[in-house]
Amino acid sequence: MSIMRSIMSNRLVRWSREYPELFITWCVMTYTFGVAGYMLGQRGLLVQHEDQVRIPSKNAHPWEDTKSSSGKSDESLDYSYKYYPRGDRSKEPRKAPSAIQYSTFPVKGVSEEVLERFSK
């Protein structure tokens, strides 16, 4: 066993003297994978994100408009997105602009039949 150790240590020493830049890289990579293995062994891969969520009790979702004029149930709620101007919660939330932009332009030189087929 001691003979095998001396052979292996001599090979490692010779290799490290011949390729010093690779030896340093090998040491850094060994250390990195060792720390990563230790951390994964300690914490595991099970993360429960639901435990870390904190929902504020007052006005948590500004896009849910609970001030319905008719007093109806959830069908009358306005769920369009709203935001606080500059993140200031003391101001009234504003309605955000629509994400869908429509543009119309005239089409020339195309028959009505083709227009009807592609306008659906």
From Swiss-Prot:
Protein origin, superkingdom: Eukaryota
GO BP annotations listed: mitochondrial proton-transporting ATP synthase complex assembly
Principal subcellular localisation of the protein: membrane
Bilayer topology: Single-pass membrane protein
Organism: Schizosaccharomyces pombe (strain 972 / ATCC 24843) (Fission yeast)
Protein name in the entry: Uncharacterized protein C3H7.08c
Keyword annotations: Membrane, Transmembrane, Transmembrane helix
Region: Disordered, residue numbers: 57-78
Composition skew (Basic and acidic residues), residue ranges: 61-75
GO cellular component, one term: mitochondrion
Location of this chain's protein in the cell: Membrane
TM annotation in the entry: 19-41
